Amino acid sequence: MAGELRIMENKSREDINLSPVSKIEIYSFFDPFSSDCFKLSAILSKLRIEYNQYIRIRHILNPSLKVLTKCQAQSTSNFDNIALAYKAAELQGRVRVERFIHLMQNEIIPKRDIITESMICDCIQNAGIDLEVFKDDLQKSKLTESLKIDLHIAREMEIEQAPSLVFFSEDVHEEGLKVEGLYPYHIYTYIINELMGKPIEKNLPPKLETYIQQQQLVTMEELLTIYEWPEKLLNKELKKLAIQQKIEKLKYPDGDFWKSKMPKIKSK
C-alpha cells in the first residue's frame, strides 16, 4: 500500500474560509470507482467508531477531470450521474449521504456494475433520503456550482489523487497534514493522537450484528478492519448470525459480502 505523507502550508485552509472546529477535521477526497477508496471507507468507519468525540470527517467526491469524466461516461442523464447524485444527496445531511455513497460503492466495486437510475434510487431510499426531494434537487444548477467549490478546495489543498485525507487541528494557524494513498490503520491513529497532543480514549465497536444492520452490506475485509478479530473467529460469529437468519452471505467477483436480513436502522 503506497502513499505519500506530506505537510501542507496553513494557507490552504484559510484561503477557502473553513471555520475551525473543536476537534480534528478530516477531509476525505474519494473516487467512487476506486477500490482503494472503497477499502479506505472501512478504515474511516473504524476511526469514526473509536474516535468519534475527537474527529469530524467531511467526504468530498474528488472533482478532478479524470473522476468527472468517468462519472459522465457512466451516465445518460443527471439521474444516473454519481457525481451529481452525491451532491443532491448531500443536501439531506451528512449521515444520509455517507450511507448513500457506502451503498453505492457496495454496488459498483464488488459487482463491477454500471451505474443505473434504478440503482441510485434504491440506494437513495435505503439511505433514508427523501426520493422526491432528491429528484427535485438533481435538476438544480446549484449542484454544478457546488462541484466547482469542491474543485476549488481540492486545488487549494493540492489534491492529486484519490484517496487523499487532509487532517487539521482546531487551530487554523497550524499546518495541515495530507496523506495520499492507502495506509495501514495505525498510521491514521498515530496522526490523530499527535494532533490531539494529549492522551485520548478509544470507544469500542458496536455488536457485530448491530454494525451489519447499520451498514446493510459489508465486506469481510471491512469487518476484519473494524473488529480486529482472527478471521477464524469472525467467520464463526458470522455463521452464527446466518443460522439465526439475521444475515446472508453473497459471493461477488471481488470477494464475499455479508448482507443484513434485519430491518435497517433509520438514519437520524
From Swiss-Prot:
InterPro entries named among the record's database cross-references: Adapter_SpxH, Thioredoxin-like_sf
Subcellular location: Cytoplasm
Keyword Transmembrane: no
Disulfide feature: none
Recorded superkingdom: Bacteria
Key word Cytoplasm present: yes
GO annotation, cellular component aspect: cytoplasm
Keywords (A to Z) from UniProt: Cytoplasm
Subunit relationships: Interacts with Spx.
HAMAP family, per database record: Adapter_SpxH
Family statement drawn from the similarity comment of this UniProt entry: Belongs to the SpxH family.
Function: Adapter protein required for efficient degradation of Spx by ClpXP under non-stress conditions. Interaction with Spx stabilizes Spx and exposes the C-terminus of Spx for recognition and proteolysis by ClpXP.
Protein name: ClpXP adapter protein SpxH
Species: Staphylococcus aureus (strain COL)
Lineage: Bacteria, Bacillati, Bacillota, Bacilli, Bacillales
Gene: spxH
